[in-house]
A protein has these predicted regions:
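Conserved catalytic neighborhood of penicillin-recognizing serine enzymes
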Residues: 2-53, 122-136
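Active-site-proximal helix/loop microenvironment
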Residues: 64-124
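A short secondary-structure junction motif
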Residues: 14, 36, 60-64, 107
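Short, charged, amphipathic alpha-helices and their helix-cap/turn boundaries
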Residues: 49-67
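Short acidic/histidine-centered micro-motifs embedded in hydrophobic/aromatic stretches
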Residues: 9-10, 56-60, 118
Length: 136
């Protein structure tokens, strides 16, 4: 499957009486991603399997994945159809999501994000200050 692969954005039955709506017809994977077409996302997840989807999320640096979390007697797992739509139990950090999407634009190469507060030269002078501002 490539960004040029074609997928049908159609109403898609996900079981349990639930349907993900789609109406654009045949679109490229690139278009499906750009337009955030939910039907295409879930169809792709079913095609490659949710296990593979979880593996890719791990490879792309998503650190909040849950496989077996019990809260008030209820068990949660991100290894489900909701993964394709971003429905993670504990959410996702924005910088991780940005770096995962950046890998698509970088020919599939993932670069771990680096956050900084300041950059100094060899004499200790501040070259870049990323500490930000706050006010009330």
């Amino acid at each position: 499957m490539t960004l040029a692969s074609v997928i049908d954005d159609k109403n898609y039955d996900v079981g349990g009486g639930k349907t993900i709506k789609g109406s654009k017809g045949d679109v490229s994977m690139r278009t499906a991603i750009a337009l955030s077409l939910n039907s295409c996302a879930v169809q792709t997840s079913d095609l490659v399997t949710q296990d593979v989807g979880m593996e890719y999320c791990e490879k792309l640096g998503i650190s909040t994945l849950v496989t077996n979390k019990v809260v008030n007697g209820k068990t949660y797992s991100d290894n489900a159809k909701t993964l394709a739509l971003g429905g993670l139990t504990d959410g996702v950090y924005n910088y991780e999501l940005c770096s995962a999407y950046a890998a698509i634009a970088n020919n599939g190469v993932y670069n771990k994000p680096t956050l900084y507060t300041k950059v100094l030269d060899h004499d200790g002078n501040v070259l870049l200050d990323g500490t930000g501002e706050s006010h009330q």
